[in-house]
């Protein structure tokens, strides 16, 4: 990698860390250059505006959803359906390890900048769509859900459950709201699985067709 690309990557990494730890609006460009160990001229060369840097950070998340979010869970959990709960548990662990300071990086940014930076909104939505894609694929690979369940809708429901649970846990500075939401969510999914098993079970006394 050239020194030019290394400098650009250092700036993106610094911005990503600061946005996650203290928020987009609370992060100044001077902080980013100091955190990255670069001169301000380098920052403005790559990112003329702060929104340009925001978009670069969102691009990073989009390109690294597997390595940054899914890989750890997928490598230790083979069952596709349990991978969904493993991903959710990853957010739980982040909340606890950071004393509720960090949640979902994209969710945090949406709350801060979706109105003030509409140019970044499509990329935020793309990040959410990728998350939903991954969860939907887990549901599909599991083969455990009823055929009449819309797997895309269920994946969106998973995302909204996670985002709401993270937000409440951070607000209360307590993991209980997160756990309560996930317990109810798991119960719902397990009921769907049970329904699928019930409908697929052979009946003991099948009804004979009517004689003509």
What is the predicted role of each segment?
Residues 59-65:
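Short, basic, alpha-helical segments at the C-terminal edge of helix-turn-helix-like DNA-binding modules
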Residues 6, 10, 14-52, 56:
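Helix-turn-helix
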Residues 116-118, 128-154, 191-203, 207:
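Hydrophobic alpha-helical bundle segments that form small-molecule/ligand-binding pockets
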Residues 94-97, 159-177, 188-198:
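Amphipathic C-terminal alpha-helical segment
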Residues 82, 122-126, 141-159, 176, ...:
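All-alpha amphipathic helical-bundle segments outside canonical DNA-binding/catalytic cores
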Residues 83, 98-119:
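Amphipathic alpha-helical segments used for helix-helix packing
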């Amino acid at each position: 990698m050239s020194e030019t690309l290394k400098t650009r990557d250092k700036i993106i990494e610094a911005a990503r860390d600061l946005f996650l730890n203290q928020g987009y609006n609370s992060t100044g460009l001077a902080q980013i250059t100091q955190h990255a160990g670069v001169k301000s001229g380098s920052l403005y060369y790559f990112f003329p505006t702060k929104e340009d840097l925001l978009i670069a950070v969102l691009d990073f998340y989009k390109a690294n959803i597997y390595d940054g979010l899914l890989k750890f869970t997928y490598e230790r959990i083979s069952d596709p359906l349990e991978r969904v709960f493993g991903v959710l548990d990853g957010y739980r662990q982040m909340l606890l390890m950071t004393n509720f300071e960090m949640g979902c990086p994209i969710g945090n940014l949406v709350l801060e900048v979706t109105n003030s930076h509409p140019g970044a909104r499509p990329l935020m939505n793309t990040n959410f769509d990728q998350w939903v894609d991954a969860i939907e694929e887990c549901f599909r690979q599991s083969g455990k859900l009823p055929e009449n369940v819309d797997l895309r809708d269920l994946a969106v429901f998973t995302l909204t459950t996670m985002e709401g649970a993270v937000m409440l846990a951070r607000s209360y500075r307590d993991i209980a709201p997160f756990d309560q939401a996930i317990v109810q969510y798991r119960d719902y999914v397990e009921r769907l699985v049970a329904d699928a098993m019930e409908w697929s079970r052979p009946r003991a006394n099948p009804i004979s067709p009517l004689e003509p």
